[in-house]
Amino acid sequence: AGSDSYIAFSPIKGEENVLYVSLADFHQIWRVDVSKITPEDKDTYNGESYAGKAIYEGVMNGKGWEDGLLKNAKFRHPRQICFTDDGKMYIADSGNSCIRVIDTTMPKERAAVTTPIGLPGAEGYKDGGPEIAKFHFPCGVAVNSDGTIVYVADTQNKVIRKLSIE
């Protein structure tokens, strides 16, 4: 069994070896410290233990939409991830037709997933501010360094959308 996967390194000082992996078909985002991979386990390293450490976000195969603490949040086919310079992770949540955000500088127990852009599950095409814009299966997201401009690859609408965040 496989999954579409998308990866990005953390931009946070002191976390240069932390890699985030979005697993679309498993509806999760994992966190892996690549400095812990040794030559002996390079072919089998799965990250930290499954008991809440390797899995950074989302319930195992628990697809859906739910904002909130990392342990409770749900995704539906999260795809591309990217970061602002201050550690906010933007996620193209394709199946929910919205963009999600995690502040990765927060301790894992207090960090939360939010949906600042799009209307979860309300696919379509609508311009407007982040709270009214509609997308249809966005697969890509890019953000400028301070998080004020977000570009979204609105896949099923076949357009690149640009949003200004204030």
Segments from the language model and where they lie:
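A short loop-to-beta-strand structural motif that recurs across blades of beta-propeller domains
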Residues: 27-31, 97-101, 158-162
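Blade-level signature of beta-propeller repeat domains, shared across WD40, Kelch, NHL, RCC1
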Residues: 137-166
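Sequence signature of WD/YWTD-type beta-propeller architectures
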Residues: 5-8, 14-20, 32-34, 41-45, ...
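Conserved beta-strand positions in repeat-built beta-propeller and related beta-rich domains
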Residues: 19-25, 91-95, 152-155
